[in-house]
Amino acid sequence: MSVFVILILFNAILNFKTVGPAAVSSKTVDCASAPCMNGGTCADGFNNFTCFCEEGFTGSMCETEYGCFRPWFYGPAFGYCYLWERVDYNWTQARESCIDQGRGAELASIHSAEENAFVYAQIRRYAWIGLSDQVTEGVFDYADGTPVDYLSFPDKNKQSETRDCVYVKHLRVDNWSLLDCRANKTSICKSTTTFSATDGCATGWVHNPATGYCYFYEERGGMWSKGREFCLDAGADLASIHSAEENAFIFDMLTEFVWLGLNDLETEGVYTNFSDGTPADFDNFPADNYQNEDHDCVSIRHLEKTDRYWFFLGCDDTVTSICKRPHEVVATQAPPYLFTTTDVPATTTTIPTTTTTISATTRTIDAMILIELLLFPNNVSSIDNIFRVNNTILVTASVLGSFQALSSQILWSITNHLSGDSVQYTVYSEDAVLVRFTTVSIFTIKATAVGNSHNLTATANATVKHVCISSLTTSVKEHCDAPHPAVYLRAFDIHISTHMELNGKCIDPMTPDFKWRIFTSTEADDVVTAFEKITHTRQVMIPRGTLPYGIYSLNLNAKTRLKTSGEVTGEKEIISWLEIQPPPLVAVIKGGASRSHGVSSNLIVDGSNSYDPDVPPGSSSNVTFLWYCVVVDPDVMYSSLDEAIQNTDNACFEDEGIMMNSTSSMIEVIANKLNANVTMNFWLNISKEGQISGLTQQRIHLTLGLLPEIEISCISNCNMYIFTAERLVLHASCTNCDSENEDVSFRWSLESNHTSVIGDLSSQTTTGLDQPYLVLKPLTFDSISEMGSIILRVTGSQSDSDGYAEFSVDLPHNAPPALGSCVVTPDEGYALQTDFTVTCSNFTDVDEPLTYQIILFSHVDVVDWMFVGRGEGFQLYEGSAPIKDGLYLPVGVGTDDHDILLQVNVRDCNMASTSVYISATVHPPTLDAVGMNLVQELLDMALLVETNVNALLAVGDPGQAAQLISALGSILNSIGDEDDSEEGRETRSEIRSFLVDCVAAIPVESMTSLKQSSAALAVVTHNKQEISTHVQMLAASTLSEMTSFVKSKSGSYTQAQENIESAGTILVEGLSNILSAAKETERLLSDDTSQEREDHKNLIEVAVSTINDIQDAIVAGKIPSEAATIITSPALSIAVGSISRDELAEATFGGPEDLGSFRMPSQDVLNQAMEHALGTTVSMKMSAMKWNPFSWPGAGGESIKSSIVGIQLEADQMLEFHDLTADIDVYLPMRETLSADPVSVHITKTSSDSVLIDHSSLPVDGALHLTVIAENEPMVALSICTARISITESSCVGTDTPLGVSNEDPDTDANFTWTVPLVDLKAADGIMIRLYDSEDQPGYENDNITLSVFMHTLQCNFWNEDQQEWDSTGCKVGPLSKPSTTHCLCNHLTGFFGSSILVPPNHAQPVIGGHKLTGVDFLICVLIGYGIYCVALVIRVVGCSFAIRVHKVL
């Protein structure tokens, strides 16, 4: 491998001018004796010469042979050449690939720790070496036959009968491991052969030794300007010819006319210079050459009898081209004495700064020389003169000021500081040279202008780093058995992905840019850009309809940039091809595959919904309609029009044939032409020039009378063959019914042959079977896919008549892949310390290729002795390889014995899938248990994760990056459960902050990457005590951006809706963690820290906005009357649904008890309130937060501590209801009835306790709830009563209500719960609590019984926007309230935070005061309805039977 390449360019070529007078050269030519050996090229210097050695040779005269061909790298300490093969192969394929390299190459053998370290430093990923025990288990040998004299396995290396081949890991100590030889990995090849020299021209270019130039024949053809543009892009120009020999050389390359770099466009008949700037000192026009005025560009044509003549052609003619650029003379690689010349080499190793000097010591500086380094061919500057290996650099020198030069040439000197040694290489040129550095180093470039009395010298440093992109490939998501180029229909989105490998030596944090461009050409051969987009991830989607029909070139340019400076660290471009074709036309007859019709009314058969998929909705498709109609047997179904015509000759109407006269999109048949008990089969054929025609049919069964005209329309999954993996959405309607006055009921069924019901859909639908809409879940038809076609029928009933319509479901004959097996190895290990591999085998399917998808579930349940994943899964992998290694698995939940579940979905190209489940045990990593060692190990682990995450993001792999983040987050969570030290918590908090930053850096450009990133964020934010305010805000903002992406993808009723709801679940989990952390932070805030409270307010506003966006995204794809989407989490729950406007009356919506629900009043009540709303569908959204988040000063709720529930209804606009004549029923959850500090009460057989009530602070109605836990005597029976309490005596006013406890465990910790109506309580002073005395009363073991008493009452509040405060006007407590649920009756529903907020007070906060009554008395202030109500609990021990003295607290 050469360290640098010098391409000598002359001043005239590059048009660079030296400033100042020129002098005549007086060089001495020393190359006449041809001193350079082995093909070396000699260059004259001032009284010296320099040899440019061909690759494989070194020495001052190229006398020493050594080295390796690129891209092999030389191991000088071992005398071998090595190649890292970046393509993934199994072990056998990898060995074959090495052998195919020739020159004795084999999979590498490693014989020392030094050689192992050398190989380790060259690779970026795991790589096969040539060691295995495939012949004899446990006996290892190398493929190249060398002895096994060195091993580098870890102490705990696992070996099994299926793990026979050895691979090397990067970033590891003891870095060898065993794996199944069928797994795909990169590989290391090794060769002992030194290689021959090359000609210095790139692949495809032809070298002319006589001129020292490289030539390229461009065969596509184009105008003269296009030919030159192509050459310039290649770092060349159209060819100039300067001799008969060069003319003959180019002539022999040709097959037709080609452009040369000569024209007379500026002045007719005058051509003095070629386009590359060189003089036109040779031409070869024929003697009788005649030039038209419009023929200005020169070409040469390959004809035997033309004597290699040149001709003038029109510059716009289409002609191929010849490009020409300088030969790349290569200097050798070798040890530090690399660039030797006949001069004495420099010995200094100091890298000089960029300077300009003169040799005279007494001369005033009135002249200077400037050096500029530019990237060629675009001639742009580089940041800090930093370049990459194999960049071509244009180095220019300009002499400024008054300087008497001895020669017009510049003496260039390049010093290589590789390995601390400085060796110079000197060459003469005019004021510009091209330099290509082929190794990493820092080079000093010195330019010297030699003058009569003194010299001018300047230096510039060039830092050369590795090119960071090693390989780049693309794959387009193709249909089954797709040809090449892949064919796509214009009506469908095109998904393209890329795979990029990085150079393992590039370790700085980088970001990728992928520039996707699609080109086509016009009839005039102009290149047109049809699509262009820049992404930061490896996928791009070309929206449907973007590309016209034709064949396209797909060009991908990938760049990696340093995060810190934006410097380009690598660039690669590849080209592939695709073809866009027109789709078939789609014929549609409104109503369904068949339907009924009563002969009492005209029959309309409507095909106006037929369409061309390439024409935007609402635009005319310009198709031609052709109708056919035959009378058929109602029990016989024909699959084609030809079959129907062959089996019947009965036209539908006597005056017409089978082909009807109508060519319009709609047919209307008057009633008197219709006969009952007849089945007519209508066929519609639509056609359009240049496209495949569309054909469909509809059977209409005619019956007596007037029937409801029932029609079915398809909303989602409406292709010719449905995708069983997507949900199917249908809608039924009655076209002749008055929806306001006549009620039609619908009933759906699944049938075959029109008569027999073959399946129960009730468990497979999210809408039920009695709604106008029918939504069938994905995979509903998988169990019956062998039938090919089935019927979905809807019957519409009205009064005493029924009508029906049918939708034909054509199922592809597509069985899922044959069941194979998958294993995870090892099946037990440690997070971030064990490499897990999933290996699948024996899955087969005719519809290849197969795709393997691995989903991780961290939480595992056991159902029927089987592991079942809980919650949303994390996608670890999706691709075509059946073996996936290097998986980063998180720590399993400790309560699940650290088990995790992997679901592997194997699907064919038609989306039929088979799933298998495998489990593994993932423990926390083995770390030091305590002290600084633990802290340091965690920090080291975080640094390793950071390095790998940056590398993964640099190649556009956000999924693998999210895996790493999630794995480290799970480790922090497992440690946090056991380590409560301040230092440990602080360290984990810092790491969590860093991980949130990592998640925020992941670009979200697909639903898959969004779910992976949001899931990682949920893991990282799991521990509320380790998430600072800053991290809370960053996490909330990141979730907000993710939610905006989800919202942009919403509104589709297809499979995308499943992804949106899944993403919503993960996002809610992350928001719940943030809200929990925010509550913890709020609890710790000091009252006088205004900035912290402002930050808290900002955080809540972002969270609330995100909640609204999640709900909006989900509801956009909800079908009316479909089951609500309910997402629950510890701190936040939401419910989202949709309903038809005419079904809103008396509708109930909500979720489980901890979310709440509401019921709307009757239609009469709602009609007036909704008269201005125009929408036909109402979206319904609820959200419940465990705590009131609006607790900052000014929000009006500083004292409100309970949960809140938001309700929002929206049609075309937000629906608000005021002063309704009937109430809306709202049921609100009571989450924390036992969260307050209880009062400890002690009673005996002979003493009781009483509660003294301040009536002035009680609500008007409702109830008081008492919850009592018997701390030390759970099997007691208590009774309470309302009592009138005085100083001298007490007595029950209300009925004595006993409450016993059974032997069964209660649902909560509470043993006793009473509800006392406030109206009863107001007739007394308070409540007495005592032991219940009855015959079956249990025996009490203790004289003293300890009770914990909790109390709360109920009130329904809402946020009054006009008054900017919490209010209860228009809301009251309903009769169905209970300790766990508050029933509110409200005559209004208005807006706040995008919804109406209702607040149930759900716990008491007793404050034990110092007010002393008789005996042992306590003053308890209870938060009731978010006012402070004081209740005196008087606890006394007296000597008489239940005597109580009472004082009323004012």
From Swiss-Prot:
Cytoplasmic face of the membrane: 1436-1450
Listed GO biological process terms: detection of mechanical stimulus
GN (gene name): REJ
Positions glycosylated per UniProt: 48, 90, 175, 184, 273, 379, 390, 455, 461, 622, 661, 677, 685, 753, 842, 1311, 1344
Domain GAIN-B: 1274-1405
Positions of region (GPS): 1356-1405
Protein name from the UniProt record: Sperm receptor for egg jelly
Family, per entry: Belongs to the polycystin family.
